[in-house]
C-alpha cells in the first residue's frame, strides 16, 4: 500500500504545502518546528534515567502500572510496534485459525476498552487493556442475524450504562448489531448472550446500511450508504423505537440550494454517498461525512436537531488543490481536473479531521495524495480557518475503487494520526500541532497477514493484525516531544549529585519531601513524559502525590504545578550568549536557545501545552484545587490557562513590537522603570521585558501613559496625534482578544467536568481592577478616545477608533460575564447581586456614549451580545425603528424583552406606544398588563375583548377608594363596555342592576350639599370614596346647617349600605340619626295650638315619618320604641322637656299605631 514512489511535486514554502520529494519508508521527514532540528535525531543532552536505572526502578516497584515489555512485531525506525495487552482469548484464536483466506474478517476496537471481531455469522467481544498481566477472562460470543451480505464490524456498536471513565462490567455493556439489509439484534446486557431483541429497519427503497453508532442515552444511529440516518432507541418493554433524523433544519434551510451554497451550507441530496460518521460525546453531536458535505446533528436522549450541512467541495477543494499543486506554473488549468474523495472523519483537540485523497488524471505518473484537513466546529457553523496537511504518502493511482485508506486519531489531546489499509499503516501528524512526528510506513505484509481494523485504548493506537492480533504503535521513548535544546535544558535543571537514584530512593522511603524537592521531582517526571516514558513519569507522580493523600498534599500539588508553569513562562534564555551573564545561578531551568524573542515565546507556548498534556495524562488535573494570585484564590486550572493566555498576548505584543518598535519600546521602558529593573548593556529592554511573560500585562497602563503624553505634546492635526491613538487601541485590542480567543478555543484543555467542591470566584487577568488593572486601563482608554480623540477626528478616523473601542468594550464586558458565571448564586446571593449591579452600571456607562454619538450599529452589536435591553430600546426609539424592536421581541423572547419594553414605555410615560403594539404582540402585552389593570382595559377594548374590559373596569371601580370621581368614571365605563359586549340579555341585565346599585350609593356622595362641602373644604373631584357611616356623619352633622328631611332620609337610606362585617350597630346609628333630626326643630311651646299633631306637622321628624310611610316602611318595626328614643343621650336637653315628650308620644300614637 505504501510504495516508495517519489513525488514529482515541489514542496511549497509553508509547512502545510505538498509532500517532500524522494521520501520512502523510514525516511526522516521535514518537521513542523524550526529547520535543522529533526525530531527523529538522538537526544544529546544529559538524561535523567539511564537504561539500567530504568530497569532496576521498575523491578523494585513490584507491579508496574503503565509501561510493560511486549514482543516486537516488525522493524521500524521511529516507532515501537509491539503486541498489546494480554494474549488473545481462545475463541478469538480459534476464529482466526479456522477462518479461510477469503473469509472477510473485520474488527472494531471500541474506546471503552472492548474489541469486537466479526467472523462470518459470529461476533466475538472481549475486554482489552494496556497491561499484559491483568487477567482478562471476559470474552463473549454472540450470533449475528442472517444476511445476504458480508457482516461488518462497522455495524456493531457498544453502549455503556456506567459513567465514562469507569471500568465497564458485562452487565453495564449493551450490544447492538445490524446487517446491511437492516436487520437489528440488540442485547441489553453482554452478560446475557441469550437475551436479545430483534427488529427490522425498513426505510423504503433498496437502501443498504454502512455504520451503526452508539450515541446519547443508550440509543444508536444506523446510517445508510445514501446518508439516511435512523435513530434506534431500545425501550424497557423490549421494543426498539426507530425514527429518521431530521434533514435540512439548519438556520439557512429553506433559502434555496443555490443561495445556501454561497454560505457553504447545503440541503441534503439524495445522491450522496456516505463515507464516515462521528459521535462527539462531549458536545452530544453527531456528524456524517459524505461525498459532498459534512452534516451535524445535536442530540439529547430522545430527539435530534439538524444543526447544519456544510459543502466541503466548495469549502475545501481549492485548499487541498492549492496545497498539492499550488506551486505548478499551470495551476489554473490543473485545478479544473483534480479529483477528490473524502474517506474518513475523526476528531481531536483542534477540531474535525478529514482524510481526503486527491489525484489528477493527467499527471504522469498519476499519484494519490492523501491529506488531513482540520476544521474547527464553532457550534452553529464551521470555522473559516482550514488547515491542510499533505502527507508524504502518495501511492500510484490505479482505480478509484482501490482507494480504501482509513484514519484513526487515537489521542484527542494531540495531533498524531494513523492512516491504514489492509496491508500497512502510515504514521503522520495532522499538521496543527507544535511539533511533527516522523512520518513512516509500517508494513504488515507477511504471508497471510493483513490489518483487520484499528482504534485506540487509553490513547494508545491499536491495530488488529490477522497474524499478530492486537498491536500497539508508539513513538520510541528517546524521541522527545520537546525541542532538543529545551529538552536538554530541562534535564540539566533537575540533574544533580546522584539525581538518578534520588528520585526513587527518596520516595520509596516514604519520607517527607521538601516543597522545593517536590517541584524538582515533578519537573523530572515531566521530562520523562516528554521522552515518552509515561511509565516512569507516572511512578514518580504516584509517589509524590498519592491518590490517598491529605489536603496538605493537594495544596502542595497546586503550588508545584503553578511554580513549574510560571518557571516555563518566565524562563531565562540561558543559551542565548547575550543572556549568559544575566541568568541567575539558580534559574528555574527551562532555558532555550532561540535568539529571536518571538521564537522564545512560541517555544514557551509549546512547553506549556506539553505540561498540560502531562498533567492530564498522569491523573493530576482532577486533583487541582486553588492557588492564591493577586491576593485572592483562583482555581489552579484557570491559573494555568491564564499563563497560556499571557503567552498568547505576549506573542501578539511582540508582533506589534516588530512594526511599532518606537511605541512599544517606550512603553517597555516605562514598565521596566516602574519595576526598577537595570538593563544589562548586552541586552535590549525588549529582551528583559519579554523574558518575564507573567508581567506582560503591565505594559497596558504604560501604553496609555505614553499615549496621553503624545496627545498633550503633539499638534492635533499631526499624523502622530492620530496614529498614537489607533496604535495603542490596536495593541490593547489584539492582546486582549488573543487571550480571550485562547481561553475560549482551548477551554476543553482546562475544563473540569465535575468539581467536587465549589471553586473560588474567577477574575481573569483581563478583568482586573485597581491601579494598572485591565478594567481600569479600558475605562481610561474609553475616556481618552471619546473625550480627546473623537471630537477632533475626521469621519474616517472616527470610524476606525470607534470600531477599536467597541472591541475593547467587548473584552471588558466579557470579563464581567466570566466573573459572574463563577459566582454561585445560591450560596453567595449578596455577592452575586452586588457584582451584577456593578456590571450593569459599567455596561451602561460604556455603551451609552455610543448612542449619544450616533454610533447605533456598534452600540447595537454590543447591546445584543450582552443583552443590554435599555440601550436597544433607546436606540430604536431614537431612530424610530419599530421593525427592529419587533425583531428583538422575537430574538430575546426567552429573556422577556417584551416585558422590559412594556415596562420601559410605562416608566417613560409612553402609554400610547405601549397600547399600539402589533397584533403579534397582543398576547404578551395582555400578560404584562395583568399586573397593570389600569391600562389593560384599554388594550382589551382595542382588541375588542369587551367582556374582559367590563370585568377589568368593574374590578378597578370596586378597588378604587382614593378618588370618588375616578370610581364613578370607571363604573360608567364598565357599564358602557358591558352594553357594547356580546353578553346575553339575562347576563347583561344582571350586570347592569349590579352596577346601578353601586351608582345609587355613589349618588349619596354626589348630592352632598354644596354649603356643607364648602364648610368642610371638600371637592367632589378630589374627594376619596366615602363609606356609608362617613356619609351619614356628613348628612347629620351640625355643619350641614340647611339639613332638611331629605338629608336625614338619605342618612337613614345609607344604613342599608353598611356591611355586616363593619363593627357598627345599625340600630344605635339609626337612633342617633332620629335624635339629630328631632334636635333640628323647636319643641319649646305649642304656639297656642292644642293639637300636638298640628303643632308638629312641619317638623323635620314628622316629615321623615311621612316619607317612610310613603316608601311603604312599617314604622312599628323600623322606628325604635318611643321610650328608648326619649331616654337617648343624643337628645340632649329635649330629654327633660315634658312638652316634647307629650308631642313625640302623640306623633308615635298617630303615625305608628295608626299605620297598624
UniProtKB/Swiss-Prot annotation:
Write the record's keywords in alphabetical order, separated by commas.
Answer: Acetylation, Centromere, Chromosome, Disease variant, Epilepsy, Intellectual disability, Kinetochore, Methylation, mRNA transport, Nuclear pore complex, Nucleus, Phosphoprotein, Protein transport, Translocation, Transport
The listed outcome for residue 448 to R is: In a breast cancer sample; somatic mutation
- Region: Disordered, residue numbers: 1-39
Q: Where in the cell is it found?
A: Nucleus, Nuclear pore complex; Chromosome, Centromere, Kinetochore
This molecule's function is given as:
Involved in poly(A)+ RNA transport. Involved in nephrogenesis.
Report the disease annotation for this entry.
Answer: Nephrotic syndrome 18: A form of nephrotic syndrome, a renal disease clinically characterized by severe proteinuria, resulting in complications such as hypoalbuminemia, hyperlipidemia and edema. Kidney biopsies show non-specific histologic changes such as focal segmental glomerulosclerosis and diffuse mesangial proliferation. Some affected individuals have an inherited steroid-resistant form that progresses to end-stage renal failure. NPHS18 is an autosomal recessive, steroid-resistant progressive form with onset in the first decade of life. Galloway-Mowat syndrome 8: A form of Galloway-Mowat syndrome, a severe renal-neurological disease characterized by early-onset nephrotic syndrome associated with microcephaly, central nervous system abnormalities, developmental delays, and a propensity for seizures. Brain anomalies include gyration defects ranging from lissencephaly to pachygyria and polymicrogyria, and cerebellar hypoplasia. Most patients show facial dysmorphism characterized by a small, narrow forehead, large/floppy ears, deep-set eyes, hypertelorism and micrognathia.
Which protein, by its recorded name, is this? Nuclear pore complex protein Nup133
Give the taxonomic lineage as stored in the record: Eukaryota, Metazoa, Chordata, Craniata, Vertebrata
Amino acid at each position: 500500500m505504501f510504495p516508495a514512489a517519489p513525488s514529482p511535486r515541489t514542496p511549497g514554502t509553508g509547512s502545510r504545502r505538498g509532500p517532500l520529494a524522494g521520501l520512502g519508508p523510514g525516511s526522516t521527514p521535514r518537521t513542523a518546528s524550526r529547520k535543522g532540528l529533526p525530531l527523529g535525531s538522538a537526544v544529546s543532552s544529559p538524561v535523567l534515567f539511564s537504561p539500567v536505572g530504568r530497569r532496576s526502578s521498575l523491578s523494585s516497584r513490584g507491579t508496574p502500572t503503565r509501561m510493560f515489555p511486549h514482543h516486537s512485531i516488525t522493524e521500524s525506525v521511529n516507532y515501537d510496534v509491539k503486541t498489546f495487552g494480554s494474549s488473545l482469548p481462545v475463541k478469538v484464536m480459534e476464529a482466526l485459525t479456522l477462518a479461510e483466506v477469503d473469509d472477510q474478517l473485520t474488527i472494531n476496537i471500541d474506546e471503552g476498552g472492548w474489541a469486537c471481531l466479526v467472523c462470518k455469522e459470529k461476533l466475538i467481544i472481549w475486554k482489552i487493556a494496556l497491561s499484559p498481566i491483568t487477567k482478562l477472562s471476559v470474552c463473549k460470543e454472540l450470533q449475528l442475524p442472517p444476511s445476504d451480505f458480508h457482516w461488518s464490524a462497522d455495524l456493531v456498536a457498544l453502549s455503556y450504562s456506567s459513567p465514562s471513565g469507569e471500568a465497564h462490567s458485562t452487565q453495564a455493556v449493551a450490544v447492538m448489531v445490524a446487517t446491511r439489509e437492516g436487520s437489528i439484534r440488540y442485547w441489553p446486557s453482554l452478560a446475557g448472550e441469550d437475551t436479545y431483541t430483534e427488529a427490522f429497519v425498513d426505510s423504503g427503497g433498496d437502501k443498504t446500511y454502512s455504520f451503526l453508532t452508539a450515541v446519547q442515552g443508550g440509543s444508536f444511529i444506523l446510517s445508510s450508504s445514501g446518508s439516511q440516518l435512523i435513530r434506534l432507541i431500545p425501550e424497557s418493554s423490549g421494543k426498539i423505537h426507530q425514527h429518521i433524523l431530521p434533514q435540512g433544519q439548519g438556520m439557512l434551510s429553506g433559502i434555496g440550494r443555490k443561495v445556501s451554497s454561497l454560505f457553504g451550507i447545503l440541503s441534503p441530496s439524495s445522491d450522496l454517498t456516505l463515507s464516515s460518521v462521528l459521535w462527539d460525546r462531549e458536545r452530544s453531536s453527531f456528524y456524517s461525512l459524505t461525498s459532498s458535505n459534512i452534516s451535524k446533528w445535536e442530540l439529547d436522549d430522545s430527539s435530534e436537531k439538524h444543526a447544519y450541512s456544510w459543502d466541503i467541495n466548495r469549502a475545501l477543494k481549492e485548499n487541498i488543490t492549492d496545497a498539492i499543486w499550488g506551486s505548478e506554473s499551470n495551476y489554473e488549468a490543473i485545478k479544473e481536473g483534480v479529483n477528490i474523495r473524502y474517506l474518513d472523519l475523526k476528531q481531536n483537540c483542534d477540531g474535525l479531521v478529514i482524510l481526503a485523497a486527491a489525484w489528477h488524471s493527467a499527471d504522469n505518473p498519476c499519484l494519490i495524495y492523501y491529506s488531513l484537513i482540520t476544521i474547527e466546529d464553532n457550534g452553529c457553523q464551521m470555522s473559516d480557518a482550514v488547515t491542510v496537511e499533505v502527507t508524504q504518502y502518495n501511492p500510484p493511482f490505479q482505480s478509484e475503487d482501490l482507494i480504501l485508506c482509513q484514519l484513526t486519531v487515537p489521542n484527542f489531546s494531540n495531533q498524531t494520526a494513523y492512516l491504514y489499509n489492509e496491508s500497512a499503516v502510515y504514521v503522520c501528524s495532522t499538521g496543527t500541532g507544535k511539533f511533527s512526528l516522523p512520518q513512516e510506513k509500517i508494513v504488515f505484509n507477511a504471508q497471510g497477514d493483513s490489518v483487520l481494523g484499528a482504534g485506540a485504548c487509553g490513547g494508545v493506537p491499536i491495530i488488529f493484525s490477522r497474524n499478530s492480533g492486537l498491536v500497539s504503535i508508539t513513538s520510541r521513548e528517546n524521541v522527545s516531544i520537546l525541542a532538543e535544546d529545551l529538552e536538554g535544558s530541562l534535564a540539566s535543571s533537575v540533574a544533580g549529585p546522584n539525581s538518578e537514584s534520588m528520585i526513587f530512593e527518596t520516595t520509596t522511603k516514604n519520607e517527607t519531601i521538601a516543597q522545593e524537592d517536590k517541584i524538582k521531582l515533578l519537573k523530572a517526571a515531566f521530562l520523562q513524559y516528554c521522552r515518552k516514558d509515561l511509565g516512569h513519569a507516572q511512578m514518580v507522580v504516584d509517589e509524590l502525590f498519592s491518590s490517598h493523600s491529605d489536603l496538605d498534599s493537594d495544596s502542595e500539588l497546586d503550588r508545584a504545578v503553578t511554580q513549574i508553569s510560571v518557571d516555563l513562562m518566565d524562563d531565562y534564555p540561558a543559551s542565548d550568549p547575550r543572556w549568559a551573564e544575566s541568568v541567575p545561578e539558580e534559574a528555574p531551568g527551562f532555558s532555550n536557545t532561540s535568539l529571536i524573542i518571538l521564537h522564545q515565546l512560541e517555544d514557551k507556548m509549546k512547553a506549556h501545552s506539553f505540561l498540560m498534556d502531562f498533567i492530564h495524562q498522569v491523573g493530576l488535573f482532577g486533583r487541582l484545587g486553588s492557588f492564591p494570585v493577586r491576593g485572592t484564590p483562583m482555581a489552579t486550572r484557570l491559573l494555568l490557562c491564564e499563563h497560556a493566555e499571557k503567552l498568547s498576548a505576549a506573542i501578539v505584543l511582540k508582533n506589534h513590537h516588530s512594526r511599532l518598535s518606537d511605541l512599544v519600546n517606550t512603553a517597555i521602558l516605562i514598565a521596566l522603570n516602574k519595576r526598577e529593573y537595570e538593563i544589562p548593556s548586552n541586552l535590549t529592554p525588549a529582551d528583559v521585558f519579554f523574558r518575564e511573560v507573567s508581567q506582560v500585562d503591565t505594559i497596558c497602563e504604560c501604553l496609555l501613559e505614553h499615549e496621553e503624553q503624545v496627545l498633550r505634546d503633539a499638534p492635533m492635526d499631526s499624523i502622530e496625534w492620530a496614529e498614537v491613538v489607533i496604535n495603542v487601541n490596536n495593541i490593547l485590542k489584539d492582546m486582549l482578544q488573543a487571550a480571550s480567543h485562547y481561553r475560549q478555543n482551548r477551554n476543553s484543555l482546562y475544563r473540569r467536568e465535575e468539581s467536587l467542591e465549589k471553586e473560588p470566584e474567577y477574575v481573569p487577568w483581563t478583568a482586573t481592577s485597581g491601579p494598572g488593572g485591565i478594567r481600569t486601563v479600558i475605562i481610561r482608554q474609553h475616556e481618552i478616545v471619546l473625550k480627546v480623540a473623537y471630537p477632533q477626528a475626521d469621519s474616517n478616523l472616527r470610524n476606525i477608533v470607534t470600531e477599536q473601542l467597541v472591541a475593547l468594550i467587548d473584552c471588558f464586558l466579557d470579563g464581567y460575564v466570566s466573573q459572574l458565571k463563577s459566582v454561585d448564586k445560591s450560596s453567595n446571593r449578596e455577592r452575586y447581586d452586588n457584582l451584577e449591579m456593578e456590571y450593569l452600571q459599567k455596561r451602561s456607562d460604556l455603551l451609552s456614549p455610543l448612542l449619544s454619538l450616533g454610533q447605533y450599529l456598534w452600540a447595537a452589536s454590543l447591546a445584543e451580545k450582552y443583552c443590554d435591553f435599555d440601550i436597544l430600546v433607546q436606540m430604536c426609539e431614537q431612530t424610530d425603528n419599530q421593525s427592529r424592536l419587533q425583531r428583538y421581541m422575537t430574538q430575546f423572547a426567552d429573556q422577556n424583552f417584551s416585558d422590559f419594553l412594556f415596562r420601559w414605555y410605562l416608566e417613560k410615560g409612553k402609554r400610547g406606544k405601549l397600547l399600539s403594539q402589533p397584533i403579534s404582540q397582543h398576547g404578551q402585552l395582555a400578560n404584562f398588563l395583568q399586573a397593570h389593570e389600569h391600562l389593560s382595559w384599554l388594550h382589551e377594548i382595542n382588541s375588542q375583548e369587551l367582556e374582559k374590559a367590563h370585568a377589568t373596569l368593574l374590578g378597578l371601580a370596586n378597588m378604587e377608594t382614593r378618588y370618588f370621581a375616578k370610581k364613578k368614571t370607571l363604573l360608567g365605563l364598565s357599564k358602557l363596555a358591558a352594553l357594547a359586549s356580546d353578553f346575553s340579555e339575562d347576563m347583561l341585565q344582571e350586570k347592569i342592576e349590579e352596577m346601578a346599585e353601586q351608582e345609587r350609593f355613589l349618588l349619596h356622595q354626589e348630592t352632598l350639599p354644596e354649603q356643607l362641602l364648602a364648610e368642610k373644604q371638600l371637592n367632589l373631584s378630589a374627594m376619596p370614596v366615602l363609606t356609608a357611616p362617613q356619609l351619614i356623619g356628613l348628612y347629620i352633622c351640625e355643619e350641614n346647617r340647611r339639613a332638611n328631611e331629605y338629608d336625614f332620609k338619605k342618612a337613614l337610606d345609607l344604613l342599608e349600605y353598611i356591611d355586616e362585617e363593619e363593627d357598627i350597630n345599625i340600630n344605635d346609628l339609626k337612633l342617633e340619626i332620629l335624635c339629630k333630626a328631632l334636635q333640628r326643630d323647636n319643641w319649646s311651646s305649642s304656639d297656642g295650638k292644642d293639637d300636638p299633631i298640628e303643632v308638629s306637622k312641619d317638623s323635620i321628624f314628622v316629615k321623615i315619618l311621612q316619607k317612610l310611610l310613603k316608601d311603604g316602611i312599617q314604622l312599628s318595626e323600623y322606628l325604635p320604641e318611643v321610650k328608648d328614643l326619649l331616654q337617648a343621650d343624643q337628645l340632649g336637653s329635649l330629654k327633660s322637656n315634658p312638652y316634647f315628650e307629650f308631642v313625640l308620644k302623640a306623633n308615635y300614637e298617630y303615625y305608628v299605631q295608626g299605620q297598624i
